[in-house]
Amino acid sequence: MPELPEVEVTRRGIEPFVAGRRVERVDVRTEMLRWPVPAGLAEQLRAREVLAVERRGKYLLFEVDAGWFIVHLGMTGTLRVLPADGLPVAAKHDHIDWIFDEFVLRFRDPRRFGAVLWHPREAGDVHAHPLLASLGVEPFSPAFTGALLHARTRGRTVSVKQALLAGDMVVGVGNIYASESLFRAGIRPTTAAGKVSLPRYERLADAVRATLADAIERGGSTLRDFVGSNGESGYFQLDCFVYDRAGQPCRVCNTPIRQIVQGQRSTYFCPTCQR
């Protein structure tokens, strides 16, 4: 599933092509993704200039004068920038095309767990949308600190890894990046969130930012379906310290990496480096 780094890589790849350009038309070939594609979306966007492309958590927000169209990639979704001249014929899982003068932005989603939604400007700020309003803070924002994590986890018995994944404290720390961040911070993923000290949470906040920044720089992680807007795979997974390395020696101390299951997801950690 594309997480924050993959979505940010997509945003950065798309923005130079669409910001300041007008949508000539929209071809909707599938009316039902995770939720119904809004009726009249093509009419709403025809001849509209894209003013900006933002990211909130794992959602992409395309602003036009009349509002925002919101895209979520789901588990297998991708947005590709393709040349309008010689555009490939749409395949089975190519659901929506936003057509500009010289190129096409194509949404592909084999499993159809992604979403394309519309938020009209008269409904208020897009960040108040029901899918966005309850999200945690952005990991690169000044609001994301060790003090925030410490305060929000007092009395919580859930594991620190599961607390990171929940998304109500900080957005975008998916399974890969939670395991990697906890390794960098030296925190065992099974530790109760409420028992982690403030200094350790300060290290964890720094580790989350560093891990996500490294992943973005490397184009995200490609485990199955993800490719960036240019069709290239990410390669962060090649440099992971612990994720998907069960039984292999720790890159720091040579202890074999262990794998356990938490909340039906695989967790990887070093029993020596993480306490």
Swiss-Prot record:
GO molecular function, one term: damaged DNA binding
Entry-linked Gene3D superfamilies: 1.10.8.50, MutM-like, N-terminal
Keywords, sorted A to Z: DNA damage, DNA repair, DNA-binding, Glycosidase, Hydrolase, Lyase, Metal-binding, Multifunctional enzyme, Zinc, Zinc-finger
Comment on bound cofactor: Binds 1 zinc ion per subunit.
SUPFAM superfamilies: Glucocorticoid receptor-like (DNA-binding domain), N-terminal domain of MutM-like DNA repair proteins, S13-like H2TH domain
Residues bound to DNA: H93, R111, R156
Single GO BP term: base-excision repair
Keyword DNA repair: yes
InterPro entries: DNA_glyclase/AP_lyase_DNA-bd, DNA_glyclase_Znf_dom_DNA_BS, Formamido-pyr_DNA_Glyclase, FPG_cat, MutM-like_N-ter, Ribosomal_uS13-like_H2TH, Znf_DNA_glyclase/AP_lyase, Znf_FPG/IleRS
EC code(s) of this entry: 3.2.2.23, 4.2.99.18
Cofactors (names): Zn(2+)
SMART domains in UniProt: Fapy_DNA_glyco (SM00898), H2TH (SM01232)
Source taxon at top rank: Bacteria
Reaction it catalyzes: Hydrolysis of DNA containing ring-opened 7-methylguanine residues, releasing 2,6-diamino-4-hydroxy-5-(N-methyl)formamidopyrimidine; 2'-deoxyribonucleotide-(2'-deoxyribose 5'-phosphate)-2'-deoxyribonucleotide-DNA = a 3'-end 2'-deoxyribonucleotide-(2,3-dehydro-2,3-deoxyribose 5'-phosphate)-DNA + a 5'-end 5'-phospho-2'-deoxyribonucleoside-DNA + H(+)
Positions of FPG-type zinc fingers: 241-275
Positions of the catalytic residues: P2 (schiff-base intermediate with dna), E3 (proton donor), K58 (proton donor), R265 (proton donor)
Family: Belongs to the FPG family.
Purpose of the protein: Involved in base excision repair of DNA damaged by oxidation or by mutagenic agents. Acts as a DNA glycosylase that recognizes and removes damaged bases. Has a preference for oxidized purines, such as 7,8-dihydro-8-oxoguanine (8-oxoG). Has AP (apurinic/apyrimidinic) lyase activity and introduces nicks in the DNA strand. Cleaves the DNA backbone by beta-delta elimination to generate a single-strand break at the site of the removed base with both 3'- and 5'-phosphates.
Subunit details: Monomer.
Protein name: Formamidopyrimidine-DNA glycosylase
Organism: Burkholderia lata (strain ATCC 17760 / DSM 23089 / LMG 22485 / NCIMB 9086 / R18194 / 383)
